[in-house]
């Protein structure tokens, strides 16, 4: 499905959630003639007002349910195919500190390899890595300096989604 907006028009994309939702959605915001690209993430409150949480300048993103996702030939699979190039693991290390803003959390996340910001229950959190198993997260945690914040391993969530740069394991 394609959509084209007129110049300087925002296109809103909603994602279905629940048991009948797709496992993954790939989005491309390609713009070679106009200024502006990327995505703004957020939600609609009870008054149907958009509440922004974060933004990215990436042109191609993939939104996946929070479970292990296997990338093969540019497609995300829920079950492991015979050959795959990348895995987006659903196990992460999460710092125990809540941050007051996306920018504050991002500054800390960028100090860790594969660090990223998560928005959990109204709080900005820093997560590190996207591992395929609890044991892999535990191994990485034992090798990661988190003394200033403390950390725990978090497992896949039935209500979470992961936004990654398409065809990579970058969250």
Where are these regions (language model features)?
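Conserved, single-site charged/polar hotspot
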Residues: 1-171
């Amino acid at each position: 499905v394609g959509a084209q907006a007129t110049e300087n028009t925002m296109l809103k994309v909603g994602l279905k959630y629940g048991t009948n939702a797709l496992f993954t959605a790939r989005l491309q915001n390609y713009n070679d003639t106009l200024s502006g690209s990327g995505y703004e993430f957020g939600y609609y409150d009870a008054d149907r007002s958009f509440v922004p949480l974060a933004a990215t300048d990436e042109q191609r993103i993939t939104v996946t349910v929070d479970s292990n996702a296997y990338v093969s030939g540019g497609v995300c699979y829920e079950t492991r195919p015979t050959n795959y190039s990348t895995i987006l693991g659903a196990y992460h290390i999460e710092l125990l500190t809540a941050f007051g803003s996306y920018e504050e959390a991002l500054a800390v996340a960028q100090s860790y390899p594969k660090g990223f910001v998560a928005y959990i229950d109204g709080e900005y959190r820093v997560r590190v890595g996207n591992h395929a198993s609890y044991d892999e997260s535990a191994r990485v945690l034992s090798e990661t300096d988190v003394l200033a914040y403390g950390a725990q391993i978090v497992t896949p969530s039935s209500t979470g989604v992961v936004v990654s740069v398409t065809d990579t394991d970058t969250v």
